[in-house]
Amino acid sequence: MTKEFHHVTVLLHETIDMLDVKPEGIYVDATLGGAGHSEYLLSKLSEKGHLYAFDQDQNAIDNAQKRLAPYIEKGMVTFIKDNFRHLQARLREAGVQEIDGICYDLGVSSPQLDQRERGFSYKKDAPLDMRMNQDASLTAYEVVNHYDYHDLVRIFFKYGEDKFSKQIARKIEQAREVKPIETTTELAEIIKLVKPAKELKKKGHPAKQIFQAIRIEVNDELGAADESIQQAMDMLALDGRISVITFHSLEDRLTKQLFKEASTVEVPKGLPFIPDDLKPKMELVSRKPILPSAEELEANNRSHSAKLRVVRKIHK
């Protein structure tokens, strides 16, 4: 039985419109989720166009099959249940050598946060899980109860950027010596015990950064995004585009760096021309990230941290 995906798509029109969709093109939605981006992209394709939609969450695919039924009947959609880090291999298996555009909506989706049993949210009591792919072996429970102190500190600093990482890791160590930490609420309460009163008064939940860090570790989110975006740049046809929505500084920093490296070139001074093999492959479509409009911010609180970056392929 599938769980309904109630998901408000962020930066919907901006993300797809910036792809400059060709009606007969081949496109990829690397993060199907609630299928909002997929549905809007498909509305711009003719029946000769095609969309490949990736998601490692079976619930997302099951629900998208209902939402996108009219396009499925026309043979315009292929679903791929896999991590988008396998983008190139899975598209090659499907006989695709080049794509005209691809969009990414990074991070956890609203339905995953809202489904209590998935264990993503510090606001809802549930077993520690946080797997985007329910078939994966590593869970938040494993990280919290079996990672040693130094590994916990590493991921809390690296992926959560929490200045109380050492104290939180130590408190977790002490708590699990008494009994395993089994639920999201238990973990959130342990984190609260460490944070000083002035931190608890700040806007936002005190456990937010640590939960983010554990989720990124469980799903290797940054590693997967790095690999996938680089593969996407290789597979783009000339004039093809990549749209990437990020929701926190780590994702945005990674995307910005990948796009910068692909769109700039350093050549020795005095060269009369830039050799073809040194020319940048990509061009920034927008130098600054595109942000949600005031109307979207008012309608959807979860869009407040979203940033959209776009590049275009200019050289093979």
Swiss-Prot record:
Q: Quick check: keyword Phosphoprotein in the entry? A: no
GO annotation, cellular component aspect: cytoplasm
Could you tell me the superkingdom of the organism this chain comes from?
Answer: Bacteria
Extract the coiled-coil ranges from the record: none
Q: Which GO terms describe its biological process?
A: rRNA base methylation
Q: Which GO terms describe its molecular function?
A: rRNA (cytosine-N4-)-methyltransferase activity
Any keyword Transferase?
Answer: yes
A single Pfam family it belongs to is Methyltransf_5
* Ligand binding (S-adenosyl-L-methionine): A35, G36, H37, D55, F84, D105, Q112
Its EC number is: 2.1.1.199
Q: Which InterPro entries match?
A: RsmH, SAM-dep_MeTrfase_MraW_recog, SAM-dependent_MTases_sf
Where found, per UniProt? Answer: Cytoplasm
Catalytic reactions on record? cytidine(1402) in 16S rRNA + S-adenosyl-L-methionine = N(4)-methylcytidine(1402) in 16S rRNA + S-adenosyl-L-homocysteine + H(+)
Tell me where it mainly resides: cytoplasm
Query: Which family does the record assign?
Result: Belongs to the methyltransferase superfamily. RsmH family.
Q: What does this protein do?
A: Specifically methylates the N4 position of cytidine in position 1402 (C1402) of 16S rRNA.
The name of this protein is Ribosomal RNA small subunit methyltransferase H
